[in-house]
Amino acid sequence: MTASLFPRRPPKRVLPGFHLTLGYTILYLSLIVLIPLSALVFKTFTLTWDQFWSAVTGPRVLASYRLTFGASFIAALVNAFFGLLVAWVLVRYDFFGKKVVDALVDLPFALPTAVAGISLTALLAGNGWIGQLLEPHGIQLAFNPNGVVIALIFIGLPFVVRTVQPVLEDAEKELEEAATCLGATRWQTFTRVILPTIVPALLTGFAMAFARAVGEYGSVIFIAGNMPMVSEITPLIIIGKLEQYDYAGATAVALVMLVFSFILLLIINALQAWQRRHTGAPA
């Protein structure tokens, strides 16, 4: 009776002027995202297939692919390991200066990439604080692929830490206590109780660090040495083609990077959806 006398009103939209905000959203996506990317794709149509294939498979370009993706993968693996350790320490331990350490984790986010590259070069070059100690032993960390990996580790670590940290904070301590009461060792508790919970977040952080490293330019060019076929990254190849007025070739290589970045974005979104299902978090 009450339901028939007072029919339920449709819920009001959270945002006032929904159609107006939707229009602004579509306009933003069109002007800032879709139109520039569409222009990139259409620019490649000026090339024949042979020209496109020659541009994206030249010896220097292939060498830059190997360095860019290989160094990004290695850096992401290192960040996955040390990012987990840093997140674990920040969540599970209290110590003097913890807030300072927690703030320093985000430093690569705020620091201009050029400043990061110059700082790493000054530190690791042959006349740097660390470089001059290692160079007599035949260890060179700057102006070669090692420098590329180090720069990518520096800029990618926060992605893993900030992805794993909230999952560790929300982990149920009761499960760990129950495992301990049942006779599990600390290692067994970590591998069978804690690790399965944080694996989705760890994979997401790995993918985000990898995606960030693939497109990195500013911090790498200062420490890489930029030697063709040795320490030349793909973004530098694109810049070089633009400086030589080879716009079609630069567009072709950029399209390859765009397709790969889009695939990475799909993988990251899939991992995040898996993480939400795994942890029971709302979508």
Please give the residue ranges for each predicted region:
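C-terminal transmembrane helix and the adjacent membrane-cytosol boundary/short C-terminal tail
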Residues: 3-5, 20-24, 39, 97, ...
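Transmembrane-helix boundary motif in ABC transporter permease subunits
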Residues: 5-13, 52, 74-105, 118, ...
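Membrane-interfacial helix termini and adjacent extracytoplasmic/periplasmic loops
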Residues: 5-13, 49-57, 62, 98, ...
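Periplasmic/extracellular loop-to-transmembrane helix junction in inner-membrane transport proteins
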Residues: 7-19, 40-77, 92-93, 241-248
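Interhelical loop and adjacent transmembrane-helix boundary motif
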Residues: 15, 59, 217-271
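Transmembrane alpha-helices
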Residues: 23-28, 77, 103, 107, ...
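Hydrophobic alpha-helical transmembrane segments of multipass integral membrane proteins
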Residues: 31, 66, 70-82, 86, ...
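Transmembrane alpha-helices and adjacent helix-loop boundaries
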Residues: 110-117
